[in-house]
Every structure is written in C-alpha cells, then in structure tokens.
From Swiss-Prot:
Residues 232-245 have a biased composition (Basic and acidic residues). Coiled coil: none annotated. The gene is rpsB. GO terms for cellular component: cytosolic small ribosomal subunit. This is Small ribosomal subunit protein uS2. The keyword Ribonucleoprotein applies. InterPro entries: Ribosomal_uS2, Ribosomal_uS2_bac/mit/plastid, Ribosomal_uS2_CS, Ribosomal_uS2_flav_dom_sf. Keywords: Ribonucleoprotein, Ribosomal protein. GO terms for biological process: translation. Gene3D superfamilies: Glucose-6-phosphate isomerase like protein, domain 1, Helix hairpin bin. Residues 246-265 have a biased composition (Low complexity). GO terms for molecular function: structural constituent of ribosome. Belongs to the universal ribosomal protein uS2 family.
Amino acid sequence: MVKISMKELLEAGVHFGHQTKRWNPKMKPYIFGARNGIYIVDLQKTVRMFRTACEFVSDVVANGGSVLFVGTKKQAREAVYEEANRAEAYYVHNRWLGGMLTNFQTIKKGIDRLNYLNEIKLNETINLFPKKERLKLEKERVKLDANLGGIRTMTKLPSVIFIIDPKNEAIAVREAKRLNIPTVAVVDTNCDPDDIDYVIPGNDDAIRAIRLLTSRIAEAVVQGKQIAAERRAAEQDKAADDKAQEQAAAEAAKPEPAAPAPAAEAAEEAPAEEGPIIEVIKKSGSEEDGEAAN
C-alpha cells in the first residue's frame, strides 16, 4: 500500500493554501486555520483522504483500468510528464483540448494521424517526400505530439483521471463528470471540491508539493499493475494445473490392454505344430525296420 507521512507533506509545503481573501467556502471542512493571511490545510485529513485515493487508483488499475494524469499549469507539467511515463500511464501536460473525452472519436483521428507521422519518421519513409512537404509534415507532427503525445496509445476512455488544480482544469472536470469518469484531484483552498470524487486537500501551486503527490499516485498505478500481473500469472498457473488434471483423468479412463494368453493354451497348441515332425520320424523308423528285415 502506498504511504505518505505528515513530515513529508510538511516538508513539501502541502499545507499552504491560498490567501484568505481568495478561497472557496466549500473548502472550509479541510482548512485547519489561517496564518499571516494564508489558509493552512488540515494535513490529518489530507493523509487520510490521500490514502483512500491511492487505494482507489490501485484497485482500478489492478482490475484492468487505466489512469489519465492531467496537469497543464507550468508548475505541474514536468512532474505530470515524468511520473506518468514512469507509471506507463496516459497524460496531458501542455493543453487540454476541448472534447478530449466527450468527443474522443474526433480526437482519435488526430491520434491516428500522429502515430502515422511518427511511423514514417521512424522508418525514414518521410525522406521520400519533397523537402517542403517534409518540413510541413514535421511541423504538424510536433504540434500533434505536444497536445496528444501523452495519449497516443489510448484507444478508449480512461477509467480514472488524476488532476492537479481542478479549477485550472475545469473543462477536463466537466467532461469527466458528464461521462461519469471518477476524478482524483489535488484541491487547493480556492477550488470547488463538489465535482471531485476523491479530494486530496493540499497545495496545488508549489512544485515540491505537486511532485510529491503526483509521484505517490504514480506508485499506486505501478502497484495496481503489479497486482494485475500477479493475478494473470496465478490464473495461467491454475489453467495449466486444470489442464494437467484433465489429461491425467483422461489417461486413467482409458481401458487396460488385453491380458496375454495363458501358458496352458500355448502348450495345447504345441503338439499340433510338432505333428509333421513326428510323422517323418515314424516313417523313417518304418523304412529302417524294413531294411533290417531284408
């Protein structure tokens, strides 16, 4: 199970919220107090809610689900890119395109185009195009990769979306809610937590805080994949054992081969085979007796 401590949260500055004049009253249950005009997040609740969120993410992935990391603000881009890649998860870290979820079939056409451009660059068939056309295609590829590179292998909608700053990613939150896709988000004191399924109260502006929380969610994804792999291995072993048992049962059900003929029967047949030889001997004996008589 993924763990996080109060000490780690404090050192990363997760407890620092926004200025008291820039807050959302709906975040009041998660606020410990205020200091020097800045709200302080209740880290005890953060630890508890973060653990719940990690368990949820791990369970979803263990059951074959996928996670999409979303963080397009400057402070979050690097952490989202690196941690999502480490967990081999999908990500959007530059710009959220409207309809990325609700109009996925159209987005999928862009993904297919990107994959095609990547392929012709990799196998160098792009060099067969005129220079002007090559430059145009490369420019198109770079633009598509910036927006769709993190989801280029995504063939269907994700099972969960992890978001840094739901206020900044309001479009992504709305699309996920419309499609009933669960959301896990780092929610600061200026955000509305109502549209988030798994709230993680904390600082969504500090780079260290974002890095810490994102890395632990990535660990939950990795853990879920390990559990899924172990389950598949166990199922394969069980299937192999069942097959071996079926084969053993089939062998046991086969009829036994017929027993060899008793020795007595062989003895009864022997005189019949020796008959001609005995007749020859008798005949020879008769001839010898005749000669002796003469």
